[in-house]
Amino acid sequence: MKITFLLTWGDEMGGTEQAVYTQATHLAPRHDIEVLSVFKTREQPFFSVDERVSVRYLVDRTGKTERPVRESDLTAEDCRHLAGLPSDLISPKWEATFDALSDVEMQRALRTIDTDVLITTSPALMSAVADLAPSRVITIQQEHRPSQLRGGTGEPLLLRAPAIDALVVLTERTKQWLEESLGKAAPRLAAIPNAIPEGFRPRSSLTGKTIVMPRRLVPDKQVDHAIQAFAKALPDHPGWRLRIFGDGPQMSRLRNLIQGLGLHDSVELLGPSQHMTEEWARASLTILPSQDGEAFPLVLLEAFAAGVPAVAYDIVTGPAEIIRHGEDGLLVPPNDVESLAEAISRLMGDEALLRSYGEKAHEGSTRFAADVIVKQWEELFTELVSRRDDPRRMAERADRIAHRVAHGGAGRFHAAVAADRTAPSSGDQRAREVVIGASDRSLVRAGGRLSEVRDDLQGSEIVQRNFETVVEALESSGIPYVLLRDRDDNPRRRLAVDAAEQTRVRKALAGAYEGKAVYAELLKPRTHAPGVLLAERLEAVGEVAGLRVFRPVVTSTRTLRFGPAYGCDIEFWRQVPEEEGGDGQFVAPLRPSAVGPKLPSLTPDARTRVKDREYPTLEPLTRKLVSDITFPVDAVYTWVDDSDPRWQERRARRRAALGLEAESSGDEAARFRNRDELRYSLRSLAMFAPWIRKIYLVTDDQTPEWLNTEHEGIEVVSHRDIFTDQDCLPTFNSHSIESQLHHIDGLSEQFLYLNDDVFIGRPVGAQRFFLPNGASRFFWSPTTVPVGEPTEEDEGYFAAAKNNRALLEERFGVTVANSFVHAPHPLRRSVLESIEEDFPESVARTAATPMRGWQDISMVSSLHHHYGYLTGASVPSSIRCAYIDVGTYSRHPELTRLLAMRGHDVFCLGESQDAEVPEHEQARIVEAFLRAYFPVKSPYER
């Protein structure tokens, strides 16, 4: 069988290149193996190549001018010109190195390639092969990173994977994410890990008291965490050394850290080494403190092959697939330096345990031996090649592509499930879930766990349900607890329980929820691996700092999951005895409560109300704190239905009366376009900001047909009810309407103003928008307001910003430069009233301008914030915000990442005036995205 690997840079030093050459070497004895590299970048490849593996290049970059490797009539000038043009085959956002010359050479080579199996090694190359490879060639994408965490480079995966034969990833966790995200559009999916590189590997004696770390010195490898943890452990284990092999931009910073911690005699920064085999033979331990992003770290395989145990952060993918916690290494919670220090100290101080782990590590490395991994690949090749000429193969491919278009999204957007931070169930727990699922057919498997399907629960209801799940178990067993309070906007409930009751708590939960889809995430476990367990299995768990209990819920779309983030935390607070210097108080095991890291007692002496009942707490936790927000916060929307014939007629008459043509530069159709965003923006408030007291929908006597106008939490307000001068109506100028919002009857002093294309992206508290003293926050944008006076040629928002600037210069003697991000605007009625009093002519002129004009001011989206800042009523702040221009094709993949990561507080779906995406296509994309992000109806819908 002829097998071709396609690499971007086959000569370079990288994990992908190392893995490919290792795999090629292992396959070479039984197959015809070729490595096809798009670019030649060195005279000799960094990695040695087995003589049985042929290496071929397309474009030579070793000289002054990039040129084809083949014989060619192209002149040097031709080549320079082509190399300077962007690639049409591969988007620069996927991989910027490709150009027009590489396009020509890839098209020539791939359209006629003579091979049985073509394996791509990046999503960008996969996309090119999906377009270019002959139909009889089996196409496989080999993923070398965690797909669920990729940024722009991962865009082609969900878009183009349906057009290839197979997608192979390194871990089951990534495979599961692809299965759930692609659904019926998925090609053949497989999880096959990397193999240990060939070569003699001497065993370590583990007697050298040396921790070895080969790591690139870049931020995501978090080498500083290893140094800090080593510094904490070293005083109890003198004589140990930490040897770090690698280089990178963090070298100077790490040297300073080592000096600052006084570790210059114990920690060495040694640069890269070509002799790591010998270094592993002298090692006793290795540490892997990386951030999320590791796929399947070869460094752990190399350590295990030498019989060296490991301690690693339990990140999304990688370490947990290699390390068997408590057998050949230890896993600790990500970014927890204290736990990392405790784990390495445990092994540094126990020679017998270290040796036991070393034996198991060496034994366990056989799971990744070449013959084991090659067998999995060969079985996959055989399966796929056997169907090469089956007519159903191409029909199934067409069906997959159709499913992606029909159900996955539109254009360059593809709906994706959230990237879970905790590992899916496996082994005995997975087997037990099969039994539980068989007894309750309403449960489905989502996110690696049994889940209940619900489309009727808001986030706050999920939180309350998990809270009640815990309280029921504790109260049934007579276990006392105290309901805590937080200072931040954490949506979870927290319960404090005496650490002496931990065994009873675990037993109570295990008994109460035996055979149920109730789970607990282990918080800072002392001996057990981090992760999520069925509640019924908690009795076997050792000491933990806390438990996060939850009932998984997923919507029928499978795009919204409620997991541990909405759980209830049980924290085991320890009373420090006097002999240990304690004062009888209980100490927080994880983080402080609203009144600090200590509590005088865990005997409840007060009650606090949550929903419809009271719960035990402590009197200090019932007091009104200076950090509490106790004032009401409303929300205000302005909304237009541009498809309403009556509204269109009113607008046309108004324009005609003003002597205007059908359109003008100040009134772009995009500003009025209704794509049903309001429905989903209201869903975002209901789901993620349930503290909003009331919503006011300001319209030109329009009401969405789906709106539940009977709900007490929403009120439709006519322009006629807020304009003090009725002669200003009808108006079709958003600046005009916004200048009157503070006249809404019953509106709270503090309120949020939102356009219907602005959404809350995750749970946030009122503290995100206001200070407890009532001050409003605002969020500056890096975008600046152009210098100069406003003119009729200015875009409407810039003209208004310039007018705002002039007013502030006259009133306060200062010049403002920046605009604001597209986010909810935190406002105060009193500030808007003061603006109206201080600048009556400007406010009145704006109110009386029925179409956007160059003399407008923008009161709520700009002037309020600067005026409030200069009068002490507003403060600058920050918010995690995304702005996606849906009128630009290149921005659509950001919607997929937004959906998969759900990591932004707020986001806005805007549209530029010169949109390249047709209106109907924009509508499809917006609908597909919003339906996936906010699948749960709000109470404001009929």
From Swiss-Prot:
Q: Which Pfam families match?
A: Glycos_transf_1, Stealth_CR1, Stealth_CR2, Stealth_CR3, Stealth_CR4
Transmembrane spans: none
- Could you state a single Gene Ontology molecular function term? transferase activity, transferring phosphorus-containing groups
Give the signal peptide range: none
> Gene3D superfamilies attached here?
Glycogen Phosphorylase B
Q: Could you tell me the EC number(s) of this protein?
A: 2.7.-.-
Q: Which GO terms describe its biological process?
A: polysaccharide biosynthetic process
User: From what superkingdom does this record's organism come?
Assistant: Bacteria
Q: Does the keyword Transferase apply?
A: yes
Q: Which UniProt keywords apply?
A: Exopolysaccharide synthesis, Transferase
Q: Cite any additional comment in the entry.
A: Stealth proteins are part of a protein family that is conserved from bacteria to higher eukaryotes. Family members were first identified in microbes as proteins that help pathogens to elude the host innate immune system. Microbial stealth proteins are involved in the biosynthesis of exopolysaccharides. Stealth proteins are predicted to function as hexose-1-phosphoryltransferases.
User: What family is it from?
Assistant: Belongs to the stealth family.
Q: What is this protein called?
A: Exopolysaccharide phosphotransferase SCO2592
- Organism classification: Bacteria, Bacillati, Actinomycetota, Actinomycetes, Kitasatosporales
